[in-house]
A protein has these predicted regions:
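Class I SAM-dependent methyltransferase Rossmann-like catalytic core
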Residues: 1-21
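S-adenosyl-L-methionine-dependent methyltransferase catalytic module, highlighting the catalytic core
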Residues: 95-109, 113-240, 244
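Low-complexity, charge- and small-residue-enriched intrinsically disordered regions
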Residues: 237-257
């Protein structure tokens, strides 16, 4: 769990989740497994607030309460019974994430809230797959597809003045289920879930072929050109800018005297 994700969900909870309800709030954390023992989880945000926290993942492990028989069909969870759904760093690892999103929409109560966090950049990190990257427009398309209202969507940019890592450039999505789904929407969501492949997704390594090899040969430059482009030329530009700034200051001082 990235520290940035934990802080994003903390902000989501403080700004959107109302804990004054007489009934315990049901929270579903999709992709909840703690892989590294000392890693934090979203559970820490909810555990002291009288909520019913359910950690869902595709296999048993630390911080996992529920492993669905079918990862794309949570038949054990009734329709519209969850108040809040959170998920961080999970969707990029789900081959058919839109089916998972449809199930989220199905189990979410009317006025229920959804908070998703996923990367828009970063190195490949298979667990066991790494299939996708997401942007605010991805959030717009996905929430419309599953019948939710998009409330917030933003992709974090890198910054030197931040105390958390930003190299993943995480996209934060907050959405709301305005009302109970009508029969048309419910039927469509069920059809999305029913479209789940009958066979498990299996990763097969695919190496470079002749097309990629030809492209790389075409765009490759010599070490001399590379050095000029990415080393000497930038240095020269900075040097010229410094000279220009120096001349401007010198002229300004001369005018004042």
């Amino acid at each position: 769990m990235h520290e940035s994700s934990l802080l994003k969900v903390q902000s989501f909870v403080e700004n959107y989740v109302n804990f004054k309800s007489s009934l315990p709030i049901k929270v579903l954390d999709v992709g909840s497994m703690i892989v590294q023992k000392d890693s934090p989880s979203f559970k820490s945000i909810f555990q002291d607030k009288g909520t019913q926290y359910i950690g869902l993942d595709v296999e048993s492990g630390l911080n996992v309460d529920y492993v669905p028989e079918d990862p794309y069909s949570w038949s054990e969870i009734p329709d519209e019974t969850i108040d809040v759904i959170v998920s961080g760093q999970a969707f990029e690892h789900i081959p058919y994430f839109w089916i998972t999103a449809a199930e989220m929409s199905r189990v979410l109560k009317p006025s229920g809230l959804l908070c998703l966090i996923f990367p828009s950049a970063g190195a490949v990190h298979r667990y066991p797959f790494d299939c996708w990257r997401f942007y605010p427009d991805s959030a717009q398309a996905l929430t419309q597809y599953i019948g939710l209202e998009l409330v917030e969507a933003d992709t974090e940019q890198s910054g030197f003045r931040k105390r958390v890592r930003t190299d993943w450039k995480e996209t934060l999505v907050i959405a709301r289920k305005i009302a109970a789904h009508d029969e048309v929407t419910s039927t469509r969501l069920r059809s999305i879930v029913a479209s789940s492949p009958t066979t498990e997704f299996v990763y097969h390594r695919v190496d470079k072929g002749p097309a990629i090899a030809q492209y790389e040969k075409t765009v490759k430059v010599s070490i001399v050109v590379y050095g000029l482009r990415y080393s000497l030329i930038p240095i020269a530009r900075k040097f010229v800018k410094k000279i220009i700034r120096y001349d401007k200051r010198k002229n300004k001082i001369a005018k004042n005297h």
